[in-house]
Regions:
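Generic hydrophobic, helix-prone segments enriched in Leu/Val/Ile
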Residues: 1-6, 70, 103, 128, ...
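Hydrophobic-cavity lipid-handling domains and compact docking modules
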Residues: 45-146
Length: 184
């Protein structure tokens, strides 16, 4: 692999990831309206879903007491040699397919952000990996749609993004706070 080839691949990966992130933000905005319209008469107005565009590389989706933060990393990554992705022939047969951009999905308590409780950590609930050919896979909590073994078998599109977001929302809603142990 030459410097020029590797640089071109990494730039293509960045461009693809950025395009997917823009599509993700559009999907989040549309989903917010659709869900709020569907639930308008059923839920308290204080727990409506709210979408916030936080700039080129971040978007937020508030769902009840949780905030899902979608964050596009501005760097391109390759997987370490121990990562399970190297068992996939799509990557093994063409090393350049292993370079991926990442969109991280975090879950925070909305009050942690609202009241600047910076000591309260969020949870990484998912990562979307996108390569030069718009092939993708997802690592994450209950993300079953496109696992590493399917990498190279599907181009990411709006339908896939909606599925990923729905899984992240469901995970956030099912994740209950646990009382920390009390030590005497």
């Amino acid at each position: 692999t030459t410097l020029v080839e590797k640089s071109n691949v990494q730039q293509k990966v960045f461009d693809n990831t950025f395009a997917v992130f823009e599509e993700l933000k559009e999907a989040l905005h549309e989903m917010t309206s659709e869900i709020n319209d569907a639930l308008e008469e059923q839920i308290d107005k204080r727990i409506r879903i709210e979408y916030r565009d936080r700039g080129k590389f971040e978007a937020q989706l508030q769902v009840a007491g949780d905030v899902l933060i979608f964050s596009m990393h501005t760097n391109v990554f390759e997987f370490n040699r121990e990562h399970i992705i190297w068992q996939n022939s799509y990557v093994r047969d063409e090393k350049l397919n292993s370079y991926c951009g990442i969109i991280n999905i975090y879950n925070f308590l909305s009050d942690s952000l609202k009241y600047n409780r910076n000591a309260e950590e969020g949870y990484l609930v998912g990562r979307i990996f996108i390569n030069r050919e718009m092939q993708y896979f997802v690592e994450g909590k209950r993300q079953m749609s496109m696992r590493h073994n399917n990498f190279g078998q599907g181009v990411i599109d709006k339908s896939a993004l909606i599925d990923i977001v729905e899984h992240a929302i469901n995970y956030a809603l099912e994740f209950d706070l646990l009382v920390p142990p009390y030590e005497i």
